[in-house]
Amino acid sequence: MKNRGLGVLVCLLALPLAAQRHKVSINAETPEGQLLQQIGQEEDAAKKAALAEQFVSQHPKHESIAWVYENMVHAYTKANQPAKAMEAGDKLLAIDPGDARTAHAALKAAEATKDPDAIKVWAVRTSDAARKAAQAPKTEDQEEEEWKAEVDFAKQLETYTEYSLYAAALQATDGKKKVELLETLEQRNPSSQYLAQAYTPIFVALQQAGDTANSVVVAEKVLAKEQNNEEMLLVVANHLLTQKQDPDKVLAYSAKMIDLMGSKPKPEGVADADWEKRKSHFMGVGHWMSGMIYSTQNKFAPADKSFRAALPYIQGNDQLLAGALFYLGVSNYRLKNIMDAIKFSEQCVAIKGNPYAAGAARNLKAIRSEYRVVQ
């Protein structure tokens, strides 16, 4: 993943630098002309930037103002003042929205700040500038090769802006910012090569940070396209179950997870025991979630079937097991399987400290009374 992005960057840097896009008109007999000369001749970045600021302050409407801003962007970049470089870039793009090279310089300045908001803004603006530049016709004063190089640069720059958003999303520490950067990348290019590379590592990072809400957002983006990641299926299905939302989707994702883990080959390098444990976890939870949905819908036969299927996989997980046993007791009572209803209810009561125990005990007492079953 990283190498592809760096490859784009290397290509961009390898292109021959074009002559400055903006022209300068100097009349050395005027104060402004002399100041322009000083700007052009000054090699110290900080001093060049200061001279450019002076010119902008004194001659804001001069015909060479774009050239001054162009010099200012590069001077501030060289002087390691990214905020000032972005400010100058903003002013220059207001004059020339198709200046892709200046936009690129401002984007690099934004990346230097590691500020996800700044990177998002400048990735979009640079993308816009690159698209304009890629469509720009050859001007009368351009050589054919120069024009082709600029168009090629613009196309590569467009791809680089996608990489910039992708890299920023990976690096962002705030889950909301990760999602915002991903969504910006989706908006700019829904088929970007970097989207597919970004989803899983960002999902994993959000999960590790305990950011369930944003994990669900990322997972749903992936599941809308393909459903072959058991972690994402589980996170979204469990979230919907907990929030009591979209029961049909919970059932669909649970079924998909069960089917996926039943047929998915063991990854290379994973021990057999570890893989069986993982499969059991996902298949057990999948059946359990299905049973919970069917129980809330009073669909007792499918609830009974789902929970019975879950039992072999959830032994030792008292939290899941207690719920499964409670609802198995209820379902079998409704299905007139009285002895099974008693058996499952007794097993639920026997699990100490579980939240279903009191309800199971009441049900057990009522069933025995109704059917005159002696304890």
Spell out what each predicted region is.
Residues 58-65, 94-102, 132-141, 156, ...:
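Short solvent-exposed coil/turn linkers within tandem alpha-helical repeat scaffolds
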Residues 94, 111-135, 241, 252-262, ...:
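TPR/TPR-like (Sel1-like) alpha-helical repeat modules
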Residues 17-71, 78, 101, 121, ...:
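N-terminal leader/linker segments that initiate helical-solenoid repeat arrays
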Residues 22-27, 160-163, 267-270, 280-286, ...:
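Terminal, low-structured helical/coil segments at or just beyond the last alpha-helical repeat
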Residues 45, 82, 116, 175-178, ...:
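TPR-repeat structural position
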Residues 35-38, 72, 106, 165-168, ...:
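Structural register within alpha-helical repeat arrays
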